[in-house]
Amino acid sequence: MGFFEKIAEGIRKTRDSMMGKVNSLLNSFTKIDEDFFEELEETLIMCDIGVQTSVDICTELRKAVKEKGIKDPAEIKDELKRIIAEMLGEDRKIDYSTKPTVILVIGVNGAGKTTTIGKLAARLTSEGKKVIVAAADTFRAAAIDQLQVWVDRAGAEIVKHSEGSDPASVVFDAISAAKARGADVVICDTAGRLHNKKNLMDELKKITRICRQQAEGCSLETLLVLDATTGQNAVNQAKLFSETADITGIVLTKLDGTAKGGIIITIHRELGIPVKLVGVGEKIDDLMDFSAHDY
């Protein structure tokens, strides 16, 4: 299965479910009236598109219907696709233009940080890049060992300290090692943290500061890993993390496991943070660049 087929298949469940619900709605109406728009708004919300974003979509759709004189609900679908595509904007990919590029990976436990790091490292090494992974989740038992397994599978290198050591020191050493060894990319793991754990959020600020200092002049990406199956809770996480970190992109995992997925639109619309990568399966090569066109 080729790259585009794989990502299309991975998000098929999400796309087909959303459009299936919309198609059912379109087929059940013979005219476009206020009842139609109310039903459409409810349908979008059920697909995990936030309330405000759903309202905005319907507002834009009302304008298009009026301006273009659309009478038949069946003609709405193309306009709906256009509005959503405009909300998602241009695809934004990770910037690998500098050497090293530093990627800080953050998020709560269980969202898929470790597997995302392993898959990303594997993808980059397969492209001929030299990758160093910083094992800066020093708080959780076995986190370093778990990451080591993924790094070995990916054919990358790891910089690690003992459990309980200072995470910022691990990041500092990893970036220093990358410079010394001529590595292309440094991927930094971090402890899974919740918004109400102030000490962990403070630690994240410290790590971010170290990254900026050590990687001055280099591309620095901060990727927030979110579990697509958690719906609106993922949006809340993104809002809270963005208060602490300068998030440059979202990694949306487990997208193959949800029939909703409107979360992508909501995050982009409400927070202005692009989804850069999506996890669409369990295999090591099931991490893809997000494509609004395929979505």
Task: Label each residue range with its predicted role.
Residues K13, S17-A136, A143-C188:
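Primarily NTPase-proximal linker/entry elements flanking Walker-type ATP/GTP-binding cores
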Residues I106-G107, D189, V225, G279:
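Short beta-strand segments
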Residues D166-R181, H195-H293:
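Conserved catalytic-core segment of NTP-binding enzymes
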Residues A191-R193:
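Short glycine-rich anion-binding loops that position phosphate/pyrophosphate groups of nucleotides
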